[in-house]
Curated annotation (Swiss-Prot):
It catalyses: 1-(5-phospho-beta-D-ribosyl)-ATP + H2O = 1-(5-phospho-beta-D-ribosyl)-5'-AMP + diphosphate + H(+). It is an enzyme of class 3 (hydrolase). It is found in: Cytoplasm. InterPro entries: HisE (IPR008179), PRib-ATP_PPHydrolase-like (IPR021130). The gene is hisE. Pathway: Amino-acid biosynthesis; L-histidine biosynthesis; L-histidine from 5-phospho-alpha-D-ribose 1-diphosphate: step 2/9. One of its GO terms (molecular function) is ATP binding. It comes from Hydrogenovibrio crunogenus (strain DSM 25203 / XCL-2) (Thiomicrospira crunogena). Pfam families: PRA-PH. This is Phosphoribosyl-ATP pyrophosphatase. Its EC number is 3.6.1.31. One of its GO terms (biological process) is L-histidine biosynthetic process.
Amino acid sequence: MSNDILLQLDKILDARKTESPETSYVASLYEKGLDKILKKVGEEATETVMAAKDAEYTQNNDNLVYEVADLWFHTLILLSHQGLSSTDITNELQKRFGLSGHEEKANRSKNDA
């Protein structure tokens, strides 16, 4: 997967911070603050779960892909609001690459102690 689209979205989301909430959906979320953004992420996560269940039943993944894209988009808005970007996440994933889930979890537990 190319990281280019994520980097492009990072730039757009950052630019929306200075745009009018009346003309930009993203700017309106930024203006409403963290709680509104978290609510949207939660809504999109729920819709993703429901789409996955539907996809299993219908054997059609189109809506699942659509909902995951919405979830990713709103998660990127959250990251941007918090001063982070997709690069922060891809860097974290890169650190975990090659580790089993059990190893990653054990390392996390040691760091939390």
